[in-house]
UniProtKB/Swiss-Prot annotation:
Positions of modified residues (Phosphoserine): 254
Top-level EC class as recorded in UniProt: transferase
Described purpose of this protein according to its UniProt entry: May be involved in plant defense signaling.
Covalent lipid sites (S-palmitoyl cysteine): 4
Residue positions of the active site: 220
PROSITE patterns in the cross-refs: PROTEIN_KINASE_ATP, PROTEIN_KINASE_DOM, PROTEIN_KINASE_ST
Listed EC numbers: 2.7.11.1
GO biological-process terms attached to the record: defense response
Name of the molecule in the record: Probable serine/threonine-protein kinase PBL17
Keyword Zinc: no
Residues with a covalently attached lipid (N-myristoyl glycine): 2
Region feature (Disordered): 385-442
Membrane topology note: Lipid-anchor
Amino acid sequence: MGICFSAEDQHYQFSQQQNYPKKTTPGKKAAVYLMKSDCEDVVGKVSGSGSGGGGLPLAPKNIKDLQSNPGYENVDIFTYEEMKIATKQFRPDYILGEGGFGVVYKGVIDESVRVGFKSTKVAIKELNPEGFQGDREWLAEVNYLGQLSHPNLVKLIGYCCEDDHRLLVYEYMAMGSLEKHLFRRVGCTLTWTKRMKIALDAAKGLAFLHGAERSIIYRDLKTANILLDEGYNAKLSDFGLAKDGPRGDQTHVSTRVMGTYGYAAPEYVMTGHLTSRSDVYGFGVLLLEMLLGKRAMDKSRACREHNLVEWARPLLNHNKKLLRIIDPRMDGQYGTKALMKVAGLAYQCLSQNPKGRPLMNHVVEVLETLKDDGDAQEEVMTNLHSRGKSVTLYEASSDSQGTRDGNGQRRRRPESGRSKSEAAVDTEKYVSTLSEPDTTKI
């Protein structure tokens, strides 16, 4: 059974949410949530609702506002009793996951919940009043997702804020999180083509946020927050840490450092200066995880490999070294040129200098060039495997296989860590403001 949300990491500080104006594109039809598999020609928009026409941005709502009127188009207010009906009285076997924020249940919204509702599977997140997420993060999700509509953002169906209860109702994502698929020990079904499609979808979601009239910085990009539907279409979820971008002649937003250690951009960790390129760094971490099949932070690995970026980034521009560390579960599924293009993109996104990172629109363009080639390549691979044949679409040097141990098993040769030309950045002393990855995942 897929899930919509996974057990979330702990966040220790909360940033003040401000205005949430978004951009609509005049003269274009909005095709929202009726998504093609390739996400092309689908336009995101701001949900207009009582704002004087034209879908103008709305001021953020507070709890009192939301208790009386949803204020946002296509977002419903549910009573707590209706939430109990939708989850069969919050049955334990309906639990999809739980963490510091509370519990996520699967549910069904239908006629038994409210007359006129067509039966719809949903995921219902109930916040723990004493948990790590508070009203500010809950409000951020409602205020952002209440106004934003895009094929690569998870859809908010409704909410409940009756008395002290805080619940969010989302569309159900049948395949669960990218994290669940990418890091499973056995049976990984994420081919090279699927990974690149997921990366493209996530990039489109970020590009949409950054391209708003007043840009939005997502601030919490990670595999646990990328959800997949039955067609492996990816959507960004969990907007509790989202923040309005700089306005006017501002170059950055100064804010408390929040996020997940291993994903946060170094300049943000050290200074609290937040820009859209902080998200680009997080996207680079995501690409690296998908290329290597390894978590951004993992203290069970060798000491020098604890931080994936510090260990692997210097190797991304070296063909032979990269082939030795690439996820072996993708063996033979990619061409060398495509691999090096994605690795080079990840390398740029992970630049220590924010100005050296590309904009997300450029990232989308680069990943788009891989799509057609990837579709054709997967078809070739499927045909070859159906005939009992195998093929390797890249060349590896003879020494890339490493040596064999006494039992005849291959073992890889150790790699050098950080490039000598790059100065190390000491981020350990800043970790107190970031969350450690939750060891309990769904």
